[in-house]
Amino acid sequence: DSLLVTIPVDDIKYPIKVVDFEGEEHTFPIVFVEVLPYFSAAGLNDEGYILVPDGSGALIYLNNGKTWTSTYNQAVYGRDYTEDPPTYVTTYPQQIHLPVFGLKMGDQAFLGIIERGDAIAHLRADISGKRDDFNRIFPRFNIIKSGTISLQHGGSFNIYQPEVYKGDIRVRYVFLVGEEADYSGMARRYQEYLVENGLLTPLKSDDPPFLLELIGAFPRTEVIMGIPRSIPYPATTFADAKRIFDDLTDAGISNVHLRFRGWMRGGLEHQYPDKAAVENNLGTETEFKSLVAYVQENGGAIYPDVGFLSVYRNRLVDGFIGIRDAARRLDQIVARVYDYNIATFEPETASAITVVSPRVLERLVSSFIKDFDKYGSGGLSLSQMGWQLNSDFNRGKGRTIDRQQAAETVSNEMRRLSDKYDIMVQGGNLYALPYTSIVVNVPLEDSGYDIVDQRIPFYQMVVSGYAAYAGEPLNQVSDSRTYMLMSLEAGALPFFSVAAAESEVVKGTRYDKFHSFNYNQWRNAIVSCYLEYYPVYKLIYGQRFVRHQLLQDGVTKSTFENGVSIVVNYNNYAIEYDGVAIGAKGYCLLEEDGR
C-alpha cells in the first residue's frame, strides 16, 4: 500500500567546468531537488484538504479561493542558525517537527513520509487558481546551501556550500481509502510507521506526571561599586526549590516532575557545559545533590536543564575555543544568534549567542556526563537538542557538516544521554523522539499563515501513548483558560513555569517574558488545576489519541484508544452535544458508554 521514491544524489550529473561563448569556465550545480511536485494533485472540482505538519498541524482546504496568499514553504525542523541571518526583523512562528505531509481528495488520501534527507527538506503547498489549476504539496530538498556576500562598494555575489549533500533522498507515499482517508487516519498510519521503525517507544508509566518548571538564576544588570555588571540573579535557590516541592506534595499533588532551568553556573545563560558546576548564588554543590536526592526519594523526578548547541559567553578558562569549536556560516563568519532592538531594528551584538559546531558535541557531552554524574540525577532536560538543528559550513578539509549529518550527530548524542538519564526536551523534532520521555513546549497551534484554514492536533495524535507532552507554560500565555482547553483537546499535560522571586525582578532584562512567574501568586491556581484536570488525565494518559473531529465552529471532539472522549467548546455560549450541556469555554468528558 505504499510507493517508495529514492533519488541517489551522488549519481546526479550536472555541468562541471563547461566553457561559455566567452571562453570562461562555469560549473552549474543542482541546488534544489523537487520530488514529484504534481503527485496526486487535486483539481478544481475536488473536495478535501492538504495536511501540513506546521506546529501542531494544519489543514489547507482544496480550492479555498485564497489566491492572494503566499505559497506555504517551510523548512523541516525549522531555522538553521548557520544560514544567512534575516535582512529584516522577523518572528519565527511554529516550526515543522515531523517530516510528513498529506493530501485528502474525496474518499482517498495519501501520506508522504520523508525517510532520508528530512533535515534538508522544505515542504511546499499551494492551491489552485494561482500558478495553475492544481492543489498540491511536495518536498523540496536543498542539496547545496547558498548564500550571498555583499561587497563593500555595492554589489554582491553568491556563495555555495563547500560540499554537496551525498546521501540519498527517499520519500515513501502511503495510500489510504474510505474511513481511513482523513487526517486522523494519516496520524494513526504515521504513528504505526514510527513504531515499526523504532522511532517511538511506549511510555514507562501510566501515571501522568505533574510538570513544573523552576527558573533558577538569570542574568540581570546590577550596579556594583558604581559599575554596571551582569550577574546571575537568584530567582529560585536550591532551598526554595525544596520548599516549593514540599508545598505541592503537601497539597496532595503526586508524581511531581521538576524541570530546573538556570541551575548551572551563569544561570539561564550558563557557561560552556564541559563541566556541570552549580550557580553559587543558588547554593552549594552539596545542597544541589541533597535537593536531587530529596525529590527522587519522595516520589518525584528532577530534570536539570542544559544547552549544548550554543555558548552565551566564551571564557578563557573553559573548553570552548571559538576559532576551533564554533559553527561557521557560508561566508566563514562565526555563526551567531542575535536579539534585535525593537526601536532601531539593529542586532544587539553585545548579547550575541555563538552557535556550537556539531563536530564538538561528542567531546562536549562526554565531558559533561563525567561531571554531572556526581549529582545522582535520574533525569536531564535538553533545552535545545529537541528543536534546534544547525549545520557547520567550515571550509576546512573534512570539517563541513551539512544539516543531515548534524541530525545524525545530535541523535547519536541523545542516544548516549538516554542510556543514563530520562530525557526531557523542548519542541520534539522527530530525531529526538526515540530517546525522549517528556516533551514540553509542544505546539498546540499552527503558525497562522493566511493560506491555512484549520489547525489540528496532528503532532499530538502521532506521539500520544509514546511520550508525555505539554504545551507552553499556562502562566505565560495570554488566555490561560482557552489554552487549557486546547491542552485538553490535544491530550497535553498542564505545565507551569515559576520561581520563588517576585515577578518584577525580570523587568528591564532579556527575560521579561517571565513577567508572571512568582510561585506564591500562582500556587492556588496550580493546585486547583491539578484537582480539576488530573482526574481527566488519569483516564487518557498513555492512551493513543485515535480520532479528532471538528463538530461545528468552535467545538471539537477528541477520542482516545480506551473509548474516552473529550468534547471542547471554545465558544462564548453554551452548547448541547449528544444530550449533554457544555458551558461557554467549557468541556465535557464522555466515557466509553457515552456517559
Label every PLM stretch briefly.
Residues 14-17, 42, 267, 313, ...:
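Intrinsically disordered, low-complexity acidic/polar segments
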Residues 206-293, 297-363, 387-391:
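Aromatic-lined carbohydrate-binding/catalytic grooves of carbohydrate-active enzymes
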Residues 106-108, 116-124, 129-131, 308-311, ...:
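Active-site-proximal substrate-binding groove within the catalytic cores of carbohydrate-active enzymes
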Residues 9-13, 262-264, 308, 384-386, ...:
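A mature extracytoplasmic/lumenal domain signature
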Residues 1-237, 242-256:
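Carbohydrate-recognition beta-sandwich/jelly-roll modules
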Residues 29, 252-254, 374-383:
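Short loop/turn motifs at secondary-structure junctions
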Residues 7, 248, 295, 383, ...:
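Conserved, mostly hydrophobic/aromatic
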Residues 6, 255-260, 302-305, 380-382, ...:
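A structural signal for short, well-ordered beta-strand segments and their strand-loop junctions
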